[in-house]
A protein has these predicted regions:
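Conserved N-terminal glycine-rich FAD pyrophosphate-binding loop of Rossmann-like flavoproteins
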Residues: 1-19
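Short, solvent-exposed loop/turn and secondary-structure capping segments
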Residues: 2, 134, 234-237
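Glycine- and acidic
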Residues: 9-14, 101, 148-157
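Elongated alpha-helical scaffolds
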Residues: 15-33, 60
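Amphipathic alpha-helical segments that form well-ordered structural scaffolds
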Residues: 26-33, 119, 165-176
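Rossmann-like flavin
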Residues: 36-141, 156
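Helical element adjacent to the flavin cofactor pocket in flavoenzyme catalytic cores
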Residues: 140-222, 227-228
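Short helix/loop capping segments that flank catalytic or ligand/cofactor-binding pockets
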Residues: 215, 232-235
Length: 237
């Protein structure tokens, strides 16, 4: 959902954005090869690195209460030993033992009443009834940023919204290398042909400016499909 835009009828809208950090290796490996649109001779990665070295992210007020007053979390987690052990137990539990469990099944108020849980759920949008396995996987992915939860110092950001800072430079780079972007196009189906041990995409069914059409494929074509999105069905209100 890196689609921040200015809409004359609604103002500036953006459906979502990435909370980035040092270990987005795939993203950074890609953008070290994409030229910056603003700094001649620099890559998007250079631009991002220099920005966060010069102006690192840091919050003096992590949470508010009573309509904007500082909650004075003061960088503390307020986790009891029992709560810390519940988190450690989840971290060590095999994935298959968590398939049908919610976070409420593995944590109790020792965790839910802690400032740590407020930090965690406000950063990663977790609810108590969400998947315990997803919670564990997030722990494993971001364990190196636990110390940065109380002040947001774990996070890094682009100069502008991620459409203008990431998507647009990549689009310009690809267009300069012959990529043909088709706008006002909705893919409705991909037809496959299955022959013995081969499954081949034969036709992309789509609508272009509301008119139904199709793209005939050959065995030499590569088709990459993103089936669904975390912002699918978004509405503004």
């Amino acid at each position: 959902a890196c689609d921040g835009i200015y809409d004359p009828t609604r103002g500036y809208v953006m459906r979502g954005g990435r909370e980035m950090e040092n270990h987005f290796e795939c993203l950074w490996d890609l953008f070290r090869s994409i030229p910056s649109l603003e700094i001649e001779g620099a890559s998007v990665l250079d631009e991002y690195y220099w920005l966060n070295k010069h102006d690192p992210n840091y919050s003096l007020c992590r949470a508010t209460i009573n309509q904007g007053k500082d909650a004075h979390t003061d960088g503390k987690f307020d986790l009891s030993t029992k709560g810390a052990m519940e988190i450690m137990k989840l971290f060590m539990t095999p994935d298959e033992d968590l398939y049908d469990k919610t976070i409420e099944d593995v944590f109790d108020e020792e965790v839910f009443d802690s400032t740590f849980w407020m930090y965690w759920r406000s950063m990663f949008a977790f609810e108590n009834w969400h998947s315990a396995l997803e919670m564990k996987l997030y722990f494993q992915r971001f364990i190196h940023h636990i110390s940065g939860l109380p002040d947001f110092s774990a996070l890094k950001f682009t100069r502008y919204n991620q459409y203008e800072s990431l998507i647009l430079p990549m689009q310009k780079y690809l267009e300069a290398h012959g990529v043909d972007f088709q706008f006002n196009t909705e893919v409705t189906n991909v037809e496959f042909e299955v022959v013995q041990d081969k499954k081949i995409a034969k036709t992309i069914e789509c609508k272009v400016n509301g008119t139904e059409t199709g793209i005939v494929l050959t065995e030499n074509d590569l088709v990459f499909v993103t089936n669904g999105s975390c912002t699918e069905g978004t509405i503004y209100g």
